[in-house]
């Protein structure tokens, strides 16, 4: 019998959730996703120090010798994310997701500006917009930024998505893809209820993605659904048939080593009609979020976590720049 990974690949686009190029080479995904935490983890690996140096050198050359180190580091942060993205694109046939600075999550204009800057860096190296997804947190401000960007043919992946109403707002904005989180929802419910586990069919994260998928398909939305943030392979197999699933190398390995039958669970051609199409404005969106303690807490936690990862990455870049150029290290 074929592995679960091979069977899953026949019904769902498998995406690698990592910045580790060696893991991507091993599992041959179609697409790949990165985020600040994954880039930070990869940047700790000796194998990727040359990419850090490349980002710093390019940024210094771009800004000039008179530019302050703090400005070079900030430029290098964007450059490093794109450098990793370009290396990933050499290994996959599809798209890479590169994330906008999470510290801009509540600033629509700044998010738009940063996204344009990121895509321009890819374009300058001959990479078309169709091969890049700009990851943006699913705040109201982020969703509105994505709505503008999509009209400019800059494709967006709305991340840190924890409830149905975030998904609806994204679909109404016409975004290319959403990343509803599974494992982080499970984490919250386990902590809130004191339960050690949930059967996969009752897993709150699985239930959430299933509802979103069926709503999108039954109402004709083109926005792709990519389940994310998995804690075990049972969550993944329960979502077999979802448009895409982005999976960590550890769970990709488990799927590759497990041989059992995998039935399709989600079918875009035969969605369950769960409710009629609804419409959200900013007021109704914020009311729905305010009434969902889990989604509000996890969105805030996610933005905070990614922001801290960016701070750490900037500090690492600063230290590396000091080694390259000499002088006293600057605390950012």
Curated annotation (Swiss-Prot):
Q: Keywords on this record?
A: Cytoplasm, Pentose shunt, Schiff base, Transferase
Q: Which GO terms describe its biological process?
A: carbohydrate metabolic process; pentose-phosphate shunt
State which pathway it belongs to. Carbohydrate degradation; pentose phosphate pathway; D-glyceraldehyde 3-phosphate and beta-D-fructose 6-phosphate from D-ribose 5-phosphate and D-xylulose 5-phosphate (non-oxidative stage): step 2/3
GO MF annotation terms: transaldolase activity
InterPro entries per UniProt? Aldolase_TIM (IPR013785), TAL/FSA (IPR001585), Transaldolase_1 (IPR004730), Transaldolase_AS (IPR018225)
One Gene Ontology CC term in the entry: cytoplasm
Active site, per annotation: 135
Q: Where in the cell is it found?
A: Cytoplasm
User: NCBIfam families from the entry?
Assistant: PRK12309.1 (NF008965), talAB (TIGR00874)
Q: What does this protein do?
A: Transaldolase is important for the balance of metabolites in the pentose-phosphate pathway.
The similarity comment for this entry is: Belongs to the transaldolase family. Type 1 subfamily.
Protein name as it appears in the record = Transaldolase
Organism equals: Prochlorococcus marinus (strain NATL1A)
């Amino acid at each position: 019998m074929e592995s679960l990974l091979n069977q899953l690949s026949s019904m769902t686009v498998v995406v690698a959730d990592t910045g580790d190029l060696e893991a991507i080479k091993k599992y041959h995904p179609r697409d790949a996703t990165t985020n600040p935490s994954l880039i930070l983890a990869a940047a700790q690996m000796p194998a990727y120090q040359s990419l850090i140096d490349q980002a710093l050198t390019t940024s210094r050359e771009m800004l000039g010798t008179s530019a302050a180190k703090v400005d070079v580091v900030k430029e290098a942060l964007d450059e490093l994310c794109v450098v990793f993205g370009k290396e990933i694109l050499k290994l996959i046939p599809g798209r890479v997701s590169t994330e906008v600075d999470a510290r801009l999550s509540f600033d629509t204009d700044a998010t738009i500006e940063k996204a344009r800057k990121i895509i321009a860096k890819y374009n300058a190296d001959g990479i078309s917009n169709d091969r890049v997804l700009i990851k943006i947190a699913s705040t109201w401000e982020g969703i509105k930024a994505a709505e503008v960007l999509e009209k400019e043919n800059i494709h967006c992946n709305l991340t840190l998505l924890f409830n149905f109403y975030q998904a609806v707002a994204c679909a109404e904005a016409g975004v290319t893809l959403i990343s509803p989180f599974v494992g982080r929802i499970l984490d919250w419910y386990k902590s809130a209820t004191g339960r050690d586990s949930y059967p996969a069919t009752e897993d709150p994260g699985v239930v959430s993605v299933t509802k979103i998928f069926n709503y999108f398909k039954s109402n004709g939305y083109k926005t792709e659904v990519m389940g994310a943030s998995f804690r075990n392979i049972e969550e993944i197999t329960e979502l077999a048939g979802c448009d895409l699933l982005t999976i960590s190398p550890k769970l990709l390995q488990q799927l590759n080593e497990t041989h059992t039958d995998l039935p399709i669970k989600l079918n875009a051609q035969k969605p369950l009609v769960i409710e009629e199409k609804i419409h959200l404005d900013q007021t109704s969106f914020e009311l729905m979020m305010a009434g969902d303690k889990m989604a509000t807490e996890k969105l805030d936690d996610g933005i905070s976590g990614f922001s801290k990862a960016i701070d750490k990455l900037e500090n690492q870049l600063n230290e590396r720049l000091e080694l390259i150029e000499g002088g006293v290290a600057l605390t950012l």
